[in-house]
A protein has these predicted regions:
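Extended, low-hydrophobicity segments enriched in charged/polar residues
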Residues: 3-283
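Acidic, proline/glycine-rich low-complexity IDRs
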Residues: 1-5, 224-435
Length: 435
């Protein structure tokens, strides 16, 4: 089939090897929280101790599903209030008529085991909790060959340059006739990593693999500061020191940070130990596709930017007519995600407000959305009703401000801001109604 000019071709981001036939999808920037087969404690020392609970009894699974706290209804993971959790579940089960109870486990369930439990419960696709975060795991995939990871672009237009989805292709020629979906993979650093479940046990974040690290800085005041401190120009506006022994990083970092703080310099810093995450990020910084690869325990893994930022993204599994898995898909540019981004972008734009509101403290009583004059203009104009025609004709009585600043003063506006051009509202009680 000939592709439409409005449908850019898919982009191959790399290949992932799955020696056990199990795929794990998570945000690599959260990789230090994945403890694999180790004690699943948080790496942050300030975090309280957590416990895992198992739901038992004749109605255990039905009660767990109704309680709806975990993808795997047989457990409650990462609870810092275990006895309270036992009591809360007990009350729920009693009220709902379930013969089930929660027990605190004497030892915690490692993340790799949780992943296996998740795919068991989800019959091949599941959500696994790790230190309160979510990853997605899939089972029953080919072990004897690499699988392509591809970026499927959005059509040209409003969201051009973003991915509609990122797919792991099992059979690129087969036709998918049905799908199932879980929600989802939690992203906090705008990235995704596709790795074999077993190989993920070798992923290291903030732990240098060779005992070395880079310490870099950037920003408006960085060039002058680099000359002062004898730092190298590393290109693309970045300065600093490469391949420092980890133990010696402080010798460079301390005077640099003291200097930045003393004079409030416009400089950002980044500590980059030679770990798996930094090896991936170094590739992403140079990649036109914002993608890179790692080798973990001899198996290839693929990392990439998701081009939509942070959030929880659904993952779907697609089957052919014979019930075989033909691809897995991280759903990125969904209609819901597009609407969310439009809302965020709109609230970063400007609006017109009268000085009666801005300076004199009058409340917003009237709102009208006109056709925007630029990409930075929301089209919204707000008045209090005390202004007459003469007042409104005087340009100095009108001020351009950000919608965000108005929302801080009048939270009720948020409910009407997505209304189309031509909408007019007036205040009534604690909210706004169409005029």
């Amino acid at each position: 089939m000939t592709k439409s000019a409005k449908t850019p071709a898919a982009v191959v981001l790399g290949e992932v090897d799955l020696p056990e036939g199990q795929l794990l999808i998570l945000d690599p920037g959260l990789g230090r929280f994945w403890r694999h087969d180790a004690e699943p404690a948080s790496p942050r020392k300030k975090d309280p101790a957590a416990h895992d609970l198992r739901i038992v009894g004749p109605d255990a699974e039905a009660a767990g599903r109704a309680y709806d706290r975990e993808f795997d209804p047989r457990h409650l993971f990462d609870r810092t209030d275990p006895q309270d959790a036992v009591k809360h579940f007990g009350r729920f089960a009693k009220e709902q008529g379930f013969d089930a109870r929660a027990e605190v486990l004497s030892s915690r369930v490692p993340h790799a085991e949780r992943a296996r439990l998740a795919v068991e419960h989800g019959k091949g696709l599941g959500v696994v909790k790790y230190n309160g975060l979510w990853a997605v795991v899939a089972d029953g995939l080919p072990r004897d060959r690499g699988l392509q990871v591809i970026g499927v672009p959005m059509p040209r237009g409003e969201f051009a340059g973003r991915w509609r989805s990122i797919d792991v292709v099992v059979d690129g020629k087969a036709e998918a006739v049905r799908s199932e979906q879980v929600s989802g993979v939690m992203v906090d650093h705008g990235q995704l990593l596709f790795a074999g479940l077993g190989p993920m046990g070798r992923f290291r974040m903030w732990e240098s693999l060779d005992g070395l690290a880079d310490y870099v800085f950037f920003g408006k005041d960085a060039p002058a500061l680099a000359k002062e401190l004898g730092a190298s120009d590393l290109g693309k506006g970045v300065f600093g020191w490469k391949d420092l022994p980890v133990a010696q990083v402080g010798e460079k970092a301390t005077p640099l940070q003291e200097r930045i703080g003393k004079d409030s310099l416009a400089v950002g810093v980044d500590y980059r130990p030679h770990c798996n995450l930094e090896r991936l990020n170094a590739q992403l910084r140079e990649s036109e596709e914002d993608a890179g690869s790692l080798v973990l325990d001899g198996a290839r893994a693929v990392g990439c930017g998701n081009r939509w930022g942070d959030g929880i993204f659904p993952v779907s599994r697609h089957f052919d007519a014979k019930g075989r898995t033909v691809r897995l898909r991280v759903e990125l540019g969904t209609e819901e995600r597009q609407q969310l981004l439009r809302r965020i972008q709109l609230r970063q734009r400007a609006a017109i407000v009268t000085r009666a509101i801005l300076d004199d403290g009058e409340p917003i009583r009237f709102a009208e959305r006109m056709k925007p004059h630029s990409a930075q203009d929301s089209g919204w104009a707000f008045s209090s009703g005390v202004e007459d025609d003469t007042y409104m004709k005087k340009a100095s009585n009108l001020v351009v401000v950000s919608l965000r600043s108005l929302l801080a003063r009048c939270k009720e506006l948020d409910a009407i801001l997505d209304a189309p051009v031509g909408s007019v509202f007036r205040r009534e009680g604690e909210g706004f109604v169409p005029e």
